Amino acid sequence: MTEIVKDEPRIEVKTLKTKYPQGAERCLINAVTERELNSSMLPADVGCVVDNVDTVCAICRAVMEGRPVIEKIVTVTGDGIANPQNFRVKTGTSFAELIEAAGGFKGSVEKVISGGPMMGFAMFDYHVPIVKTSSAILCLTKDVVAANEESACINCGRCVSGCPARLVPSRLATYAEEGQEELFVKFNGMECVECGCCSFV
């Protein structure tokens, strides 16, 4: 890519470390520009626009071809799916249809997640539609889910060193569980980027 844009003075390619969650909007802006955003700011507040490749392609199709966003590429994967693969589907296609197109469930599926393993959310109804923000369907068996069950916090501090927002997740989790909203806000809970790093220490 650097070679392709070498004669374009307005474009610079910046190589970053492969590091999660560096692709998150605030983390990416900081890594590329060293500008900091808080939860009340938009990228435009620090002179940035952040788009992923899918969005850039959608903009091109809309401007050049007059095509609205009616399709998405969705990955169906996990140890609980028979034939993991990528699909280009119309928005509105149900999760159930995609699971069936990928050969259905394999084994004893315990959890189906919309999105990835770190920032995705559990699905309880598979007859919901694919929307513009859908990216993946992750199907996990009982064995995988059991290996990642929640355990009691021992205050080891590893979640603190792993937090890209420089928060104290163990304290924030306690405040959230106890419904202590004022303390949650006081200790910058709203700055959490919901990357899930603290869940995997």
Predicted segment positions?
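Active-site gating/interface segments in enzymes
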Residues: L28-T33, G103-G157
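Short, solvent-exposed coil/turn elements at secondary-structure transition points
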Residues: K17-P21, M118, K142-D143, E178
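Extended, hydrophobic interaction surfaces within ordered domains
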Residues: A101, F105, I113-S114, G189, ...
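Generic beta-strand/beta-sheet core signal
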Residues: K14-L16, T77-D79, K90, I113-G115, ...
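Short alpha-helical segments in extracytoplasmic peptidoglycan/chitin-binding modules
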Residues: G92, E97-I99, V112, C163, ...
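Hydrophobic alpha-helical positions that pack around
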Residues: M1-F95, A101-S108, G116
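Ferredoxin-type iron-sulfur electron-transfer modules in oxidoreductases and energy-metabolism complexes
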Residues: S134-E150, V160, P164-V201
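Catalytic-loop motifs flanking and including active-site residues across diverse enzymes
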Residues: T55, T91-F95, N155, V168-R171, ...
